[in-house]
Amino acid sequence: MPTIHSVQRTTPVHQDRYFVDTNVWFWFTYCASKEISTDRSPKRYQLEKYPEFIEKVLDSGAKLYHCPLVYTELANIIEKTEFDIYCENNPAATINRKEFRSLESEREKVMSEINLAWRTINDLSTCLDINLREDRVPSIHELLSTTTLDSYDALYLGLMQQEGIEKIITDDNDFVSSTVADIYTANNRIL
């Protein structure tokens, strides 16, 4: 059972090493500069508490980590959010996400947002190599079978274990079912 820590009450130290879950990066890099009013808008605490904690971690000299899979998950979330914003601003539009990708100006905006977010993540944290070989599947499958993690989070946890990283910054209560040592969160459902 992981130890749960409040990001508001934690003081990071130089030796700390944190893996940052994708949604935290999303709120830190993309949402921080936008007012999003879709059905899936971030909550105020997500936009305030996680960026504040990331800044505290960086100020302490502690290390932040991500992996290349964060890019695919983040790109999908940003595209979905931009699509939702487009649909809300254009209620007469009856397009799906694939058709949305064909709108040149919207595609450029999405790609610009993804590029900016990814550059920021790489500027602030270390990208861990991920080996997605067939021999890794059984351990990931075991994590999926014994926790409530989704496949991305199971891969992240497997990578953290491989790299000896025991701390994760996340809003996701599924990590409570995992073997990660320490969860850092602002989510009151977990605390």
Predicted regions located by residue number:
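A short acidic, often aromatic-flanked loop/helix-cap motif at beta-alpha or helix-coil junctions
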Residues: T72, R133-S139, R189-L191
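Acidic active-site catalytic centers that drive phospho-/nucleotidyl reactions
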Residues: D21-N23, D153, D172
